Structures are given as C-alpha cells and as structure tokens.
Curated annotation (Swiss-Prot):
The keyword Repeat does not apply. HAMAP family: Ribosomal_uL10. This is Large ribosomal subunit protein uL10. One of its GO terms (biological process) is translation. The lineage of its organism: Bacteria, Bacillati, Actinomycetota, Actinomycetes, Mycobacteriales. Belongs to the universal ribosomal protein uL10 family. NCBIfam families: PRK00099.1-1. SUPFAM superfamilies: Ribosomal protein L10-like. It comes from Corynebacterium jeikeium (strain K411).
Length: 171
C-alpha cells in the first residue's frame, strides 16, 4: 500500500503540472536556504518553486500527461511551476545563476515539448509579452500617424506622391 504522505505529494505535484503554463527544472545543490528564498522572491508570485524527488516528478508529470526527458531528472532537482510569463521566470533564473555558480538550469517543459538548458537561456533573452506588445503598438502608431498625415494632405500632394511612386516603379 502506498504511503499516504507520498500519495498526497504526488497528487499535489500532478495538480501543479496540470495548472502550470510551463515548468523549469533546476539543480539546487549547494544553495543555502537563504539563497533559495532569494530565488523564490526573484521568480515572483506567478511561480511556485519547490524541491521534489526525481521519481515523484516523473510520476506526477506522467499522470498529468507530460513526458519529461530523463536527462532532466538526474541529481537534486527543484521545479518551478510557471503560471505567468515563462520569459520572466527564465530571466530571473538566468540572472540568479550569474551570481550563484552552484545553481544550474536543467531545462523544462513548455508548449507541449521538453526544452533543454540552452533553450531556457534563449527564452531568457526574449522580450516579455508586455514589452513586445509595447513595441508593436509603437510601430503601429508610427505607421498610423503617417497614414493620417497622408489622408489629411491636400489632394494635390496626394497626386504628386502618386506620380512620384509611378515614376519610381517605371525606373
């Protein structure tokens, strides 16, 4: 008969896998409790970071319909369940790793696929959703301003512009 404590832990991990938008796995060997707490703060409230046995992680992931690469489940493993921006979590982990040489990003699971440490590092280099949307809005605003200027121009300027474009095409 299964240990009730292990069964409860397994169910909790399974629920976290099912609810998380992505997961990131790390090796925490050599980190103090204070350093782990510092990492949790850096990850923010959208990320649950916890230590678990590799066999429990493997079983919970499988029960949640996720197949993790076996190479991610070696050594002491901590897992970050990301319910917000994976980019922000990856950046926080990468920055934390710069100051704490014992901290190792193993990889994770995102968008239905296992990712390795190099892919997590690449994700950390991306802009987050808010920044990307702001850049897109800025680009669109510039284009819209040009279009508005064109629509507000007198008809003679529009005709000259059309003629210039026609000449350019003919050349």
């Amino acid at each position: 008969m299964a240990n009730p404590k292990n069964t409860a832990s397994l169910e909790e991990l399974k629920a976290r896998f099912e609810q998380a938008q992505s997961t990131l796995l790390t090796e925490y060997r050599g980190l103090s409790v204070a350093e782990t707490t510092e990492l949790r703060r850096a990850l923010g409230s959208d990320v649950t970071y916890s230590v678990a046995k590799n066999t429990m992680i493997k079983l919970a992931a499988r029960e949640a319909g996720i197949e993790l690469d076996e190479s991610l489940l070696t050594g002491p493993t901590a897992i970050a369940f990301v319910n917000g921006e994976a980019v922000d979590a990856a950046k926080a982990m990468k920055d934390f790793g710069k100051d704490h040489k014992n901290f190792v990003i193993k990889g994770g699971y995102m968008d239905g696929a296992t990712i390795d440490a190099a892919q997590v590092e690449a994700i950390a280099e991306l802009d987050n959703r808010e920044t990307t949307l702001a850049k897109l809005a800025g680009a669109m605003q510039g284009s819209l301003a040009k279009a508005a200027g064109l629509f507000n121009a007198p008809a003679s300027q529009v005709a000259r512009l059309a003629a210039a474009l026609q000449e350019k095409k003919e050349q």
